[in-house]
Amino acid sequence: MLQTDNLTAAQPQRIVAAQTASAQEELLERALRPKTLDDYIGQHKAKEQLAIFIQAAKKRGEALDHVLLFGPPGLGKTTLAHIIAKELGVNLRQTSGPVLERAGDLAALLTNLDPHDVLFIDEIHRLSPVVEEILYPALEDYRLDIMIGEGPAARSVKIDLPPFTLVGATTRAGMLTNPLRDRFGIVSRLEFYENRDLTTIVSRSAQLLQLDMGEEGAMEVAKRSRGTPRIANRLLRRVRDFADVKNNGVIDAAVADAALSMLDVDAQGLDVMDRKFLEAVLHKFGGGPVGLDNVAAAIGESTDTIEDVIEPYLIQQGFLQRTPRGRMATERAYLHFGLPVEK
């Protein structure tokens, strides 16, 4: 049984946020993380491709081509990076774009790699230009070109590197420079999960946590998880708390529904912030079109928060449209709130 008593994460501002809420939540994610491609649920196309590329690299005794994983947060990019290293039977070194401030930071990592090791850089779109320039020859030729000294005494030193695999992860592939993007031989986009796969993930997590949970309870959690395993596992922990107090730890569909309703997560995975936004568009602006600034003023949120946090899921699920004239509620939004559809 996993020991999780001291790993319970504090509830984030939005329980349906896809970002990791805390260090404690990250620790629990690691405990629940699948270790092999066979255990990894969902992302069938990416998983099938990686399995073939990994087997081919091992068969030839070569380093795997550099891998770029992109897609919304919480879908398993970090998990896949760990699995790639595990399947290759090599070490994984992990860092993130913002941490690599100077060329020396990257050089220290690269020169300590063993042959065929995996270097995982999360948020790779946030690499500084200086570090990115150093990375190019390392990716192409397994070589570092570093300037030592300053002024007339400066000289270039070339350092040979062992063959290695860079796995880069990003939620914003469009922010990668073309030269960096072109150096990845394998590019995989991770998609939002189907409810069927999320139900399997919730059931697996419940089993690891030794929870008394039936399939209907897992389905109830899955369908409110916004297609995101990280959210599913977070909701599962809160449902577990509710079941421990209200139903002797037994989680069925009714208990899951009651727990998630108490948390203001409705049957479509919308929370208070989502509903507040949609209700403003529907009731205050007649369903739209309405400008972003007007909606932001009406609900007391910044335009950045609306664009980056609220709107993506609503658009992806078909509750909202962005048009040249502004935001418009869709037919699905009217039906969700029990309103007559505007013609």
From Swiss-Prot:
Natural source organism: Neisseria gonorrhoeae (strain ATCC 700825 / FA 1090)
Binding, DNA: R322, R327
Protein name per UniProt: Holliday junction branch migration complex subunit RuvB
Stretch list, region Large ATPase domain (RuvB-L): 4-193
A molecular function GO annotation: four-way junction helicase activity
Function recorded in the entry: The RuvA-RuvB-RuvC complex processes Holliday junction (HJ) DNA during genetic recombination and DNA repair, while the RuvA-RuvB complex plays an important role in the rescue of blocked DNA replication forks via replication fork reversal (RFR). RuvA specifically binds to HJ cruciform DNA, conferring on it an open structure. The RuvB hexamer acts as an ATP-dependent pump, pulling dsDNA into and through the RuvAB complex. RuvB forms 2 homohexamers on either side of HJ DNA bound by 1 or 2 RuvA tetramers; 4 subunits per hexamer contact DNA at a time.
Domain of life, per lineage: Bacteria
Subunit structure: Homohexamer. Forms an RuvA(8)-RuvB(12)-Holliday junction (HJ) complex. HJ DNA is sandwiched between 2 RuvA tetramers; dsDNA enters through RuvA and exits via RuvB. An RuvB hexamer assembles on each DNA strand where it exits the tetramer. Each RuvB hexamer is contacted by two RuvA subunits (via domain III) on 2 adjacent RuvB subunits; this complex drives branch migration. In the full resolvosome a probable DNA-RuvA(4)-RuvB(12)-RuvC(2) complex forms which resolves the HJ.
